């Protein structure tokens, strides 16, 4: 009865500034949890969110699973 893959999937966007400078300046890597519709956004999602380790709004990209 199932049609295959689910259309809505859970993704984890990650701060690219913390990921790039890991170990040097910041204490950790900021990650959020959200959902996306695979049919409407087939490419990787980029969101501008607040990173508590950087202390500013940065771009968060969807990670590989």
UniProtKB/Swiss-Prot annotation:
Molecular function, one GO term: structural constituent of ribosome
Record localization: Plastid
Main location: plastid
InterPro entries: Ribosomal_bL33 (IPR001705), Ribosomal_bL33_CS (IPR018264), Ribosomal_bL33_sf (IPR038584), Ribosomal_zn-bd (IPR011332)
Keywords linked to the UniProt accession: Plastid, Ribonucleoprotein, Ribosomal protein
Superkingdom of origin: Eukaryota
Gene Ontology terms: biological process: translation
Pfam families on file: Ribosomal_L33
Annotated SUPFAM superfamilies: Zn-binding ribosomal proteins
Gene3D superfamilies: Ribosomal protein L33 (2.20.28.120)
Gene Ontology CC terms: plastid; ribonucleoprotein complex; ribosome
Similarity section: Belongs to the bacterial ribosomal protein bL33 family.
Identification of the protein by name: Large ribosomal subunit protein bL33c
Organism: Aneura mirabilis (Parasitic liverwort)
């Amino acid at each position: 009865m199932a049609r295959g893959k689910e259309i809505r999937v859970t993704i984890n966007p990650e701060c690219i500034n913390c990921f790039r400078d890991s170990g040097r300046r910041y204490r950790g890597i900021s990650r959020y949890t959200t959902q996306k519709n695979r049919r409407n956004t087939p490419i990787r999602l980029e969101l501008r969110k607040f990173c508590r380790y950087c202390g500013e709004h940065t771009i968060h990209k969807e990670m590989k699973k």
